Amino acid sequence: MVWNRSLAETDPEIARAIALEITRQGAKLELIASENFVSRAVLEAQGSVLTNKYAEGYPGARYYGGCEYVDIVESVAIRRAKEIFGAGHANVQPHSGAQANMAAYFAFLEPGDTIMGMRLAHGGHLTHGAKINFSGRYFRYVPYGVEEETGRIDYDRMHAIAREHRPKLIVGGASAYPRELDFARMRAIADDVGALLMIDMAHIAGLIAAGLHMSPVPYADVVTTTTHKTLRGPRGGMILCPEEYAAAIDKAVFPGIQGGPLMHVIAAKAVALGEAQRPEFKTYQEQIVKNARALAQALQERGFELVAGGTDTHLILVDLRNKGLTGAVAEDLLDRVDVTVNKNMVPFDPQPPRVTSGIRIGTPAVTTRGMKEDSMVQIAEVISLTLDHPEEGAVQARAKAIVAELCAAHPFLKL
């Protein structure tokens, strides 16, 4: 029967695409800040028979029978999340960070309520109030942003905007902001205007788990995150909150916006959270930051302008206007030499979102492969050779050769 055959036997077209993707991930430098490589254990959990099990509800209160073992899995994930982040309650069921944000909004807001979020072009996220997203359609969105001179969040201006508009909820967090976020300052602003504070820590969850970035948990009414990126787990979402909001959050997730949870993904989340509790995880996170700073410095030495002047995290935002390139062109040029980045808007960007004036770079994936500061200098050289000499084939070939050497010296997970 079909169900007892291998993937290669059943669907060679899909099997080939997966095989090619394995090759791509191993042969290219992954510098997209939101991407990482999970462990073999996480892959095994996500590819397990738990994908067969429906489990609407929560541990001990399911709408289906036969949930005794998935209850164990989800309970372990919840316990580990609470231990790592010091939270009173954790919901590990959101299928994504976007759905975690949606559930948080629905737990505390009504349609038409005012939310404040970081402007998308200044480093915010679609789900923080962008007009093209559900968050900008269902709620009245008021943006805050960064100072043009420094590229850093203007907290005084943020406070003034909050006093003017009196939002019901302020959203902190970003998808393209390289500096540490001041959650204590955000809490003070929220308290002054009587607003709830929601922090989306998706990009920096791993750094926070390792104690390398201020934790939002003591300051926020609700914290959302993805479970991949720096946390190095499966693609998914999670919500943390004080115990007093547990019932509202759980109800907003199920039955509010989701039905059955993805138990195989929750198992993978549990495994990744277990990995995050080990001493080597902190060492890994420390190396992510060291690598980001080394790469930032090496890029600056080669004439690249960095938004906010550098980085405190895993992420670097490069403004390419002084190079005469758009983000879209740079992304394509780098892909040709086997370096993967994403085009990204920079603050006060004159280019449209599909073009942009910048690229976003992150170090989590290359750090997972074991690369350190010396490799970051080589990566900066590759970027410089590629973007400063786009029409010179010999230079491009040299850049591609450096990438091949780096990838060979730091092998991808063997599957």
Swiss-Prot record:
Its EC number is 2.1.2.1. The keyword Ubl conjugation does not apply. Keywords: Amino-acid biosynthesis, Cytoplasm, One-carbon metabolism, Pyridoxal phosphate, Transferase. Pathway: One-carbon metabolism; tetrahydrofolate interconversion; Amino-acid biosynthesis; glycine biosynthesis; glycine from L-serine: step 1/1. It is found in: Cytoplasm. The record marks 228 as: Plays an important role in substrate specificity. GO terms for molecular function: glycine hydroxymethyltransferase activity; pyridoxal phosphate binding. It is an enzyme of class 2 (transferase). Its cofactor is pyridoxal 5'-phosphate. Transmembrane segments: none annotated. GO terms for cellular component: cytosol. It catalyses: (6R)-5,10-methylene-5,6,7,8-tetrahydrofolate + glycine + H2O = (6S)-5,6,7,8-tetrahydrofolate + L-serine. PROSITE patterns: SHMT (PS00096). It holds the Pfam family SHMT. InterPro entries: PyrdxlP-dep_Trfase (IPR015424), PyrdxlP-dep_Trfase_major (IPR015421), PyrdxlP-dep_Trfase_small (IPR015422), Ser_HO-MeTrfase (IPR001085), Ser_HO-MeTrfase-like (IPR049943), Ser_HO-MeTrfase_PLP_BS (IPR019798), SHMT-like_dom (IPR039429). CDD domains: SHMT. Catalyzes the reversible interconversion of serine and glycine with tetrahydrofolate (THF) serving as the one-carbon carrier. This reaction serves as the major source of one-carbon groups required for the biosynthesis of purines, thymidylate, methionine, and other important biomolecules. Also exhibits THF-independent aldolase activity toward beta-hydroxyamino acids, producing glycine and aldehydes, via a retro-aldol mechanism. This is Serine hydroxymethyltransferase. It comes from Desulforudis audaxviator (strain MP104C). The lineage of its organism: Bacteria, Bacillati, Bacillota, Clostridia, Thermoanaerobacterales.
